[in-house]
């Protein structure tokens, strides 16, 4: 087959690709070998080989709480030591009214803190929720729940909970002890399958994780209302009953009508509900809701259907009327607001906004007239988590990639601007929780050689180590893990990779290699975490004599807007070119058997796997594609149109990425795997690809998990990866 001009240019660039100096974790070749039950989440022994962690660790004011054995532990963060108070399940049982005692177990009930100042937690028990005041040592109220109760959202005070049942929204007030449960208030009564309240909307894109939003004092509840009646339903079939049952999934596909979302505000004092007057067009995205501290204004980041414009609008909470547009952000590719406004402590008119307007996600200080006061953080790195403020409200705390795209560190900076200060300088990945008053942090740290270390730090006063996890791999054979960089297909962008070498590696021998790929937005597979972010299956395959290689190609996360947006309107092209540069690097290694290269990925990685098998069948002998996007016309609007635009606007891009049209190009062994009730990449994708292959007289293999959605989770995940392993060992 003749090579196109693009392929010739691509091969020329990759021929120049060299790996920059790499680092390696030394192998431990003696010891036992792992099983999948030990390496895979859901496996019977997985948690025996998972780094130790502190269960339920979270802040309560300047105290932190967690579960240890059968006890709830309550610690005062005061520098280099900890003042500890313990409550056992037995202690709590003694405080409970008759008939509400905890079951006798070795594990303490799960919980969450509610009100930072009052020591209030909610304990999740069978049949209900228990409000417990740790400082007063008493049970304060009870909430009755059942399996139909969903989307629980507690008020800031903690005495009320909003929830969804049968598509309607309710608010319940906890009953006092001895008085039974109070009756719930129905905020809405007309909910149906096509009209839903209080749930996450817009396919959970734009950072949307829930559908209810309490005002700061708990006086009002804002909520989403989603009308799906204009969306053609996709059937999701449950095959377990004697007669299979079909349930509709209202899944708006690219280029088709989208659902209509509005925002309501329920006022508890009057029982009145008003809806924001967001106007026309109705097909837009209402994202990142946030309240003003005085509860008078609700702010909404409104994104147009084309997703190239974001307006931050203010609405009157009493009437729902539009007040003003604070500012507008546009981008020639796409905008993607992910975070609501965060007001400065004690201020009703100044807030922090996160934006990629300069090419990197940074923090900006605004006032409520829409005036930009200043850009607070700046540089060719990404703020990955805005944590909050110091007690005086003069400094910001955040996590970022300033040290390296592979790391996260916790920084502070003066709100007036200036140099950032790294408060967690140890090289690796720091996941932090700032205390509500901004005086202390919980730092959960990992590095390639540190399984997990948990430290509580009073900022400027000292630290207390809560946990230093032991190496869970002790006594087991571990392969060498190499990390480094290669050059992208553009010849100028470094890409990070990880390479798990075969166990008992002999440089004089030849070994097969499996490329594990994702390649799409919002994912980063190579980081400086435990085992250099190498997963359990990589180690399992190394035991069987395979190398496993992963490179984060352009389009993946945390490298800035230009790095990600290069894929816009042409998904699968730039990412594939970069992945092939990774293959070129592998082929340059004397120990790689170039005739035995495989590829595996899931979701976007399933799309990439199938694409690579169809495009480079002369390179990849075997592929396993899980939950693959096959035709982007059949993917949902919010994600698909952001990166592709609408099919009517970019028919060439959709056509180039439509793998149905290339089913006849399949040469190697390809197995597709799909969950039969997948609501993310609907089953239709891989089924239609099979149909196209039948017509083209090509012969993929296929495996279905009837009881699983987009990912195969729980104990069946071990079965999944045994299936994948067998496919590679049989054919590669």
Curated annotation (Swiss-Prot):
Coiled-coil boundaries: none
EC number: 3.4.14.12
GO biological processes: proteolysis
Active-site residue numbers: 603, 678, 710
Post-translational modification: The N-terminus is blocked.
Effect of residue 636 to A: Reduced activity
pH behavior: Optimum pH is 6-8.
EC category name: hydrolase
Temperature and activity: Stable for at least 12 hours at 25 or 37 degrees Celsius (at pH 7.6).
Activity control mechanisms: Strongly inhibited by diisopropyl fluorophosphate and Pefabloc. Weakly inhibited by 3,4-dichloroisocumarin. Not inhibited by phenylmethylsulfonyl fluoride, leupeptin, antipain or prolinal. Activated by iodoacetamide.
Record keywords: Aminopeptidase, Hydrolase, Protease, Serine protease, Signal
Recorded family membership: Belongs to the peptidase S9B family.
Function (record text): Serine proteinase. Releases tripeptides from the free amino terminus of proteins. Has a requirement for Pro in the P1 position, but is inactivated by Pro in the P1' position.
Protein's name in the database: Prolyl tripeptidyl peptidase
Provenance organism: Porphyromonas gingivalis (strain ATCC BAA-308 / W83)
Chain's gene name: ptpA
